[in-house]
C-alpha cells in the first residue's frame, strides 16, 4: 500500500472528525475547553524542573499535583485540567524507531481532587473521544484492571461499550502506584484500533501495529501500607493523561506521531538543510530526522526552563540529547545556514515558533535557547571528528577480530572525546557490533574510585575505627555551636589514635576525639570545620585543627594534637572554638547565600548552586550557567551583595518540616538529601535557603564583599571566588602593596600607572607591527622567485607552491603580491611548514571562481584535513592550518590536482 493510499485510509477512518480543525494546537485547546465547560480550572504547565528535589524531570501531568494527592498540600481547586510538557529518556533508543516513542511530549490531563470519580471520568473520556474529537466508536477499545468490576460495569452498562471491546488486564498494565506505599489504584485505558477489519477474535491491545493507547484514566482510591495491604482512601481522586502527539496522529490520519504538525515542521526544516526530501528518504534517514525533530523539541523546552548542558543531572540529559542531534545531523550532511556557525539553532527556531500553546515562555527565552545550542554544538564539534575517527578504527578492528567493542574502549571514547555511551552504542549497532556495557560501567566505577582516592583526606584506618566507635557508642554528639562557641563541660566519649580506639593519648599524639556535647562545627554544606582548643581540669591542652562527621553523621570527630599533658577517655573538657576563624567562616557562608541571590537577580532565576566552599580566608561558589558573566554583570552582582550588607538585614534560622520549607519557596540544592525536618536560613526579602551552616546574625557583620575571580570549571559550570569581611581588608592591603611596587618600578606616581603601561603597550605594538612588516617583505621576496613556476591552465594562471618558515600573516601578504604579479585568472595555493605545524592560504580571483566553480574554502579545507587540521574562508580567499607537516607536499599536490581539473578546458 502506498503512503498516499495509507494516509487516505487513516483519514477516512473517522468520518465525524472530518471538517474539524485537527491541528495539534486545536486539539490542545479543544481538550482544555471541553473540561473547562465541565467545571475544571485550566492551569498552566509546570516547569520541566519539578519542585521535588528528588525527581530529576517532570514526567507526567500529575506531578505538579502530587503533594495534593499525597495529602501534603491543601487543594486550590476541586477540578483542574492542564497540558503538561514532559521529558522521559528511559526509551531513548526507541526514538525514531517506533511510531510513538519520544523524549519530549505533551500530556493533556483532567484531574479531580476528591470530587467526581469513575463514572464521570469514564463518561467524559468517551464523550471527548467519540463526540468532541469524532473518533469512530467502533474503533475505540477499553482496558480495565482485572479486579475492577465497577469500571467494567460502567464502560459496559453506562457508556455502552460492547463487552467484546473491553479487556481485563493484569496489574503491570492497569494498576498505578506512586511507589511501594501510598496512594494507588486501578486504571482504565482507551485504545484506538487502526485495523478493525482484523476482527475481535484474539485481538491483543499490546499489538503496537494495530492499537495505540491514547487516554489513561487512573482511579486513585486505595492506600497501600508497608505490609502490602490496601485500604480505601478517604478522598478518591482522578488523574488522567492523553498524549497530544498520539491523538494528533489519529485525527490527522498519519502513520506515526512524527508526521503530525507538532513535529513534522521541525523534521522538514532539518531535511531542507540536508538538501533532501523526507518523503524520498530511506528508513535510516527518516529515523535520523525523527531523532532530530524529537530531541530538538526536548532541549529547547529544557533550556527554556533553565537546564543547561553539563555533565551532571538534568544538564547531562540536555548534553546527551543535543549531541545525538549533532551526530545525526552530520550523518545527514546538514550544514549551518549562510552566516551561521552551527546548524541546531536554525532547526530549534521552528520548534520555538510552535511553542506558544504549550508554554509561552519558550518564545520569550528564544535568545537563551539559541545561544546555548550554538555553544554546545560548537563545543561538541571540536571533539566529534577525532572521536568518530577513533570509533571507526575500533569498529573495523572488531569486525576483523569478530569481537565486540570493549567497555574500556567505549569508556575512552566517553572520557577523552566526550562521546556519550548511547552514541557509541548507536554507531556500533549500525555496524552490527556489540558494546560491552558491563565493561564500560566497570571502567567508569574504576575512574570514580581513583578520583575518590586522589581526593581522600581522612585516614582510612582511622575512619574504620571511628565507624566502630560510632556503632559502639550508639549515641550521637550534640552540636551547640549555633548558640555558643564554647562548652564548659564536654565529656570525652572516645579517642582514636594511630587507627585504634585507645583509653589514653600522650603529649604529642595526633588524635580523633569524640565529645558528647560540642560547639565545634563539623565540615558540611560547603563550610569547613572549626578549629580551636580543648582543655582538661588537670592542665592538658589539645589544639583542634579539623572537625568532621562520622558514623553516618551521628558523631562529631575533632582532629587534634595533644600539645600539653595527656587526654583520657571519660575526661571532662572545656571546648573553645577559635572565634576569629568562626567569624570569618560565618561571614563567608552568609555571603554565599547573598551571592546566589544576586546571581539569580542579574543572570536569571535559572542560576542554581553546583557546589560551594566557605573557608576561613575566602569563599568559592559554583553555579550552572551556559556562558560567562560579563564584567559589568559581575560588578552588578558585587554591588548588590554589598548593598544588602549595608542594609543591616537581620537573619533568622528556623527548623520546620520540609513540606513547609517548600511551600515557603526555600531554595534547595538538587541532589542533596534532606530529612523530614530541615533548617531554613532566611534573609528577609533577599535569600531563603535550606542550610545547616553557621551564619552571621545581621548582614552588617560581614562588612564587605569582593569578587576575586570568575571562570569556567566544567561545561556549563562557572566558579566565583571571593572574599568577605576581614578578607576584604587583607585584599586591599595586598593590592595596595602591589600598586606601590609597580609605581616604583615604572617610576611614576600610583595614579599614573595606567597611562605609563598604555604607553609601553603602544611602543610594543609598534615594534611588533614593524617586525610583521619585515616578515611580510621577506615573504614577498621569497615568493618573487615563484612567479615563474605558475602554469597556464585554460585562461587561468595556477601557482601551487611551498614557502617554508613563513607565518600565516606573511603567507597572506605573499599570496596577495603574487596575485598582483600574475594578473587576471590567478589561482594561488601556498603552504608553509613551521616545525610540525602547517600554514595554508588560497586566493582565487573572480574569473577563476566563475570559470572553474572553485571556492577557496573548499579546496583549502581538504588540504588542511590531510595535514590534520582545518580552516576556511570566503570563495575568493581562505586560510587554514594543520599539525602534520609531513603531509604538506601531499596536501599541495591534491590541491593542484583539484584546481587544475576544475580549470582545464572541457
Swiss-Prot record:
It is found in: Plastid, Chloroplast; Mitochondrion. SUPFAM superfamilies: Class II aaRS and biotin synthetases, Putative anticodon-binding domain of alanyl-tRNA synthetase (AlaRS), ThrRS/AlaRS common domain, Translation proteins. InterPro entries: aa-tRNA-synth_II/BPL/LPL (IPR045864), Ala-tRNA-lgiase_IIc (IPR002318), Ala-tRNA-ligase_IIc_anticod-bd (IPR018162), Ala-tRNA-synth_IIc_core (IPR018165), Ala-tRNA-synth_IIc_N (IPR018164), Ala-tRNA_ligase (IPR050058), Ala_tRNA_ligase_euk/bac (IPR023033), Ala_tRNA_synth_plant (IPR027522). Residues 1-10 have a biased composition (Basic and acidic residues). It is an enzyme of class 6 (ligase). Pfam families: DHHA1 (PF02272), tRNA-synt_2c (PF01411), tRNA_SAD (PF07973). It comes from the Eukaryota. One of its GO terms (molecular function) is alanine-tRNA ligase activity. Residues 1-22 are annotated as: Disordered. Belongs to the class-II aminoacyl-tRNA synthetase family. Consists of three domains; the N-terminal catalytic domain, the editing domain and the C-terminal C-Ala domain. The editing domain removes incorrectly charged amino acids, while the C-Ala domain, along with tRNA(Ala), serves as a bridge to cooperatively bring together the editing and aminoacylation centers thus stimulating deacylation of misacylated tRNAs. This is Alanine--tRNA ligase, chloroplastic/mitochondrial.
